[in-house]
């Protein structure tokens, strides 16, 4: 199952990797790397999520409460980014914002297939297996996401203003805790729904 999921992840990442003009390696190499890493990451999820959380990985029948909460939270987060953070970030990190529908779809698939797997599903389930403590696993997963974001920002050619950096980090931490909660209550499908709604905010600003 992990191999099949890793293959699906690699295929879903192809559009964005192929559109990445300044990539440091050929697409086939990046695809192979995603596939091999995906096997390991999905292995964490399928091997340890259900035994240590007592929750299914895929919850096909979502409960109304978590679904409504995730929907409202995604809409609020989208509004905060679209009205406050995106206008400040778009000029500084243009490569993170899609210009047209093709790029938006590629960004969406990449986020659904790999970003959530790398930042949420796999680290949380690995930490649950390692620590056997939901509180510790949640906090360390959120911390990991915050560190990745901080490293990403520090690698930019032009540094963000401290206030903007602090605001972005704070919002991401809050969203990290919400994401873990939704993952536990609704599984991967609820996180994918939350991600779709959040990424859909870009549709309002496409050139085409």
Give residue spans per PLM region.
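Function-critical hydrophobic alpha-helical transmembrane segments in multi-pass membrane proteins
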Residues: 96-147
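Juxtamembrane "helix-exit" motif on the non-cytosolic side of transmembrane helices
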Residues: 12-22, 83-92, 151-160
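Central hydrophobic cores of alpha-helical transmembrane segments
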Residues: 4, 138-148, 189-202
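Transmembrane alpha-helix/helix-exit interface in multi-pass inner-membrane proteins
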Residues: 72-92, 111-124
């Amino acid at each position: 199952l992990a191999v099949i999921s890793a293959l699906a992840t690699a295929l879903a990442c192809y559009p964005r990797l192929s559109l990445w003009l300044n990539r440091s390696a050929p697409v086939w190499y990046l695809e192979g790397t995603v596939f091999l890493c995906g096997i390991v990451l999905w292995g964490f999820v399928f091997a340890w999520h259900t035994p240590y959380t007592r929750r299914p990985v895929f919850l096909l029948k979502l409960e109304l409460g978590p679904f409504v909460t995730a929907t409202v939270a995604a809409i609020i987060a989208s509004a905060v980014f679209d009205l406050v953070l995106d206008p400040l970030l778009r000029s500084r990190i243009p490569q993170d914002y899609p210009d047209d529908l093709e790029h938006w779809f590629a960004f969406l698939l990449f986020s659904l297939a790999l970003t959530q797997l790398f930042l949420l599903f796999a680290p949380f389930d690995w930490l649950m297996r390692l620590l056997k403590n939901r509180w510790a696993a949640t906090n360390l997963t959120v911390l990991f996401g915050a560190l990745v974001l901080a490293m990403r920002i520090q690698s930019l050619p032009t540094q963000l203003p401290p206030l903007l950096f602090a605001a972005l980090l704070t919002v991401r931490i809050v969203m990290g805790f919400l994401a873990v909660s939704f993952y536990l209550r609704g599984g991967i499908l609820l996180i994918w729904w939350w991600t779709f709604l959040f990424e859909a905010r870009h549709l309002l600003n496409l050139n085409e």
